[in-house]
Regions:
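A structural signal for short loop-to-beta-strand junctions that line the ligand-binding cleft
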Residues: 95-96, 103-104, 135-172, 323-324, ...
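Short, solvent-exposed loop/beta-turn-alpha elements that line the ligand-binding surface or hinge
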Residues: 127-139, 183, 209-213, 229-254, ...
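Glycine-centered hinge/linker elements that transmit conformational signals in sensory
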Residues: 194, 238-277
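Hinge/lid segment of periplasmic solute-binding proteins
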Residues: 41-46, 109-164, 321
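Conserved N-terminal structural module of periplasmic/extracytoplasmic solute-binding proteins
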Residues: 22-115, 120, 132-133, 363, ...
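Extracytoplasmic/periplasmic solute-binding protein
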Residues: 154-158, 191-244
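Conserved C-terminal helix/tail region of periplasmic/extracytoplasmic solute-binding proteins
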Residues: 174, 392-441
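Extracytoplasmic/periplasmic substrate-recognition and gating elements
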Residues: 71, 176, 298-371
Length: 441
């Protein structure tokens, strides 16, 4: 199989997401029959007392769900997972690898990082753990291809998210006569809705792009959603990924300025200022629309926002007290976390087998905030209509693209994150910001 290029990442995942949702019919619980038991201990021997060192993207909010997913494996095997999670985990993985101390398992979002590590011969083929047939038999072919580098299968995708979701309180909208947007709505419709809400003396938006070492990525998510839904947005998005279109293109500048139109217009944001936007953690920014009384009307963030909202406000009912409508234009970006290993030790392979199973992934799906790409986990497993709707959006979006900065990875990704933060603070420096991003290509 040929090497997976950055442009093929985009094309392959677009096909993969569609294939995955088409496979999710009614759950007859037979889809996972080809997998090993969720405990994953088959063939591992005695691994009790051993700890598997895992680096991943999930922080404190998502960690309890990951731990719930892993607990059956720990109970069955007597082994444990030693997990370190942070949003900037790609840099930590790189540092550990370059320092000669790689983790046993890594679960980042950056497909570009995975591809680079595999091409350098740093990763362990899944066949060394006896997992290749299992992955090929239970995951859509396009996802299998995306985890394959130079003909060798190194990784599998465990969790997917759409990022075409704007979160709101349906009751607040109904009380004020505001209409949620649809996939057919335009950017102008979103601006008009923003103006209408602002005129009611409620801040239309809550926006926070703080995220520790990776601050700025929520702003990048806004911008790539805008790019995809512009006129000829798919062509522009694809060109930015494969490098045929520079970041200094006037259409890219327009997309950033559209983000600024929302974030930097006085009265639009509950955080009150550019400094407030940069200082507010992205998780905390999901709260204001659902406070009593609400401090904002809307928050843009991927489908995983449902987890933060539900944890902060456990009495809210999905679909009644919080829901989402599609980003104007209907096109959706999204991402998926890839799982790969640096060794084939028995405990490492046993944990991989568990994480790859339908039974294990169904645990997190049922808890919420998780979309599985395993063909044995159906839409019926999702806990409510809001969660099912987020999974369904991956199929219904008129266009879908893999998260742009995750696909680019490395220095360019960090320049985009830093650029988003700088733009919020100093919008008059946009030309310089875009030139700096382009200089990393």
């Amino acid at each position: 199989m040929p090497v997976i290029t950055r442009s093929r990442i985009l094309i392959t995942l677009t096909i993969a997401i569609t294939s995955f949702v088409l496979s999710c019919g009614d759950d007859d619980d037979d889809g996972g029959a080809a997998t090993q038991p969720a405990g994953g201990a088959t063939g591992a021997g005695d691994i009790s007392g051993q700890a598997v060192d895992v680096l991943g993207i999930w922080g404190a909010d998502e960690l309890p769900n990951l731990e719930a997913m892993v607990k059956p494996w720990e109970d069955e095997t007597g082994a444990s997972m030693d997990f370190t999670g942070q949003r900037g985990v790609g840099a930590l993985i790189t540092s550990r690898v370059e320092g000669g101390n790689p983790p046993d398992v890594a679960i980042p979002a950056e497909v570009g990082l995975f591809q680079d590590l595999a091409s350098e011969g740093r990763l362990t083929p899944l066949s060394d753990c006896g997992l290749e047939d299992e992955i090929r038999g239970n995951y859509p072919e396009a996802f299998v291809n995306l985890g394959t580098v130079d003909g060798t299968l190194y990784g599998f995708f465990m969790k997917a998210d759409t990022k075409g979701t704007i979160w709101y309180n349906p009751k607040t909208f109904e009380e004020n006569g505001w209409e949620p947007l649809t996939a057919d709505s335009t950017w102008e419709d979103l601006v008009a809705l923003t103006d209408e809400i602002r005129d009611s003396d409620l801040a239309p938006w809550s926006i926070g792009i703080g995220s520790e070492a990776d601050s700025g990525w929520p702003g990048s998510d806004w911008i790539q959603q805008i790019i995809l839904n512009m006129d000829d947005g798919e062509e522009l998005y694809d060109g930015l990924l494969d490098g045929s279109i520079p970041y200094t293109d006037p259409r890219v500048k327009e997309a950033w300025e559209r983000f600024g139109e929302i974030a930097l217009t006085e009265g639009n944001v509950s955080q009150g200022s550019s400094a407030g936007i940069n200082a507010t953690d992205f998780r905390v920014a999901t709260y204001p629309p659902f406070e009593t009384p609400p401090a904002a009307a809307m928050n843009y963030l991927g489908a995983f926002a449902a987890l933060f909202i539900a944890e902060q406000f456990p009495d809210l009912v999905p679909g009644e007290d919080f829901d989402f409508f599609p980003f104007p234009g209907g096109g959706a970006t999204g991402g998926s976390n890839i799982v790969f290993a640096f060794n084939s030790d028995p405990a490492t392979c046993s944990l991989l087998r568990h994480l790859a199973s339908a039974d294990a992934q169904r645990i997190w799906v049922e808890l919420g905030g998780f979309t599985s790409v395993h063909t044995g986990v159906s839409l019926d497993a999702y806990p409510n209509e809001t969660a099912r709707g987020a999974a369904q959006q991956l199929l219904e979006a008129p266009s879908f693209r893999f998260d742009l900065d995750d696909a680019l990875g490395g220095e360019t990704q960090q320049a985009i994150f830093a650029g988003a933060t700088e733009y919020i603070a100093n919008p008059n420096q946009l030309d310089s910001i875009l030139s700096n991003i382009q200089a990393t290509r």
